[in-house]
Design a protein with these regions (language model features):
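A long amphipathic alpha-helix within ATP-dependent nucleotide-binding catalytic cores
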Residues: 123-128, 171-229
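Short, flexible loop/turn elements at secondary-structure junctions
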Residues: 60, 81, 132-134, 149-151, ...
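Short catalytic/ligand-binding loop motif for oxyanion handling, primarily in non-cytosolic enzymes
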Residues: 41, 64-67, 83-88, 97, ...
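Short, solvent-exposed loop/turn elements at beta->coil junctions and helix N-caps
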Residues: 60-65, 133-136, 223
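Phosphate-binding site of ATP-dependent enzymes
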Residues: 71, 95-187, 229
Length: 261
């Protein structure tokens, strides 16, 4: 809330305050590589292996440089510096290129550093990548498992569904035992029935540990696709460090887990 500004910013207490503090005080060159959607693949593969990486089909600086004839029938376009501009193409012959261009070009203009002072993004060169279209045989779309890791220790995760429509989206925080966590987010409805635990959950936890070691806080996002674990992305400041927790005291409880000294 607004009381955040009144507190001494050099003595952060809550989770959100500590993420704000880290934004200003914890700046390492490799962070740029870790949040760049193209470069992160190489970084992550060097730690957990190439088999967990969704293949890249191409990288471009401008939408008009994309040679669609070179791409397969199905693919995904995204911007390397932004989590908003996502174009999922299931059938190239039906792709609305004009709409895709508009979405990607809007995303290319977003700068997380200017918007939320998220330093890792400051030096990310905005590019467009095409990735292989991944589909789970269940046909239920991909579920993202987002692990909240504190110095290499995953304590909670959240799963979400249908995030493209805020009214019907569901989001729940879970413990490492796949039980409902004692907190949530005030801006999303929770699942009434928890989604099933992924079959490769233990492997996911191991991967989250390997990728988050040495960082006071890191969110590690993973997919399970056809019983295989794939890397999604790494995030230093979820919600830019303005996560609306309910009950509110969990902002401070999670803050205790972030060791910044």
């Amino acid at each position: 809330g607004s009381e955040m500004c009144i507190r001494d910013s050099n003595n952060p207490v809550t989770f959100n305050e500590k993420l704000q503090w880290l934004k200003l005080n914890d700046r390492k060159p490799e962070y740029t590589e870790m949040v760049d959607k193209f470069m992160a693949k190489k970084y992550v593969a060097s730690i957990i292996g190439q088999e967990h990486i969704i293949p890249t089909l191409g990288v471009w600086s401008h939408f008009d440089d994309i040679d669609f004839d070179e791409l397969p029938t199905q693919f995904v376009l995204k911007c390397t510096h932004d989590s908003g501009g996502l174009v999922v193409c299931k059938d190239k012959s039906n792709l609305n290129k004009k709409a895709a261009k508009k979405k990607i070009e809007k995303s290319m203009k977003t700068n997380y550093y200017k918007g939320g002072r998220e330093w890792p993004y400051k030096n990310v060169k905005p590019q467009i990548i095409a990735e292989e279209y991944m589909e789970d045989i269940s046909g239920n779309g991909l579920t993202d498992y987002k692990f909240y890791c504190f110095n290499g220790d995953p304590k909670y995760l959240y799963v979400s569904n249908g995030m493209d429509n805020h009214e019907t989206a569901r989001l729940s925080f879970l413990t490492m035992n796949w039980e409902k966590a004692p907190f949530g987010r005030s801006d999303y409805l929770e699942f009434e029935v928890l989604p099933p635990k992924p079959t490769k959950f233990d492997e996911m936890v191991k991967i989250a540990k390997s990728l988050s070691g040495g960082h006071p806080f890191l969110r590690v996002d993973l997919y399970e696709i056809n019983n295989k674990v794939y890397f999604s992305e790494l995030t230093f400041s979820p919600c830019g460090g303005f996560m609306p927790f309910v009950p509110e005291e969990w902002d401070a409880k999670l803050g205790e887990m972030v060791n910044i000294r």
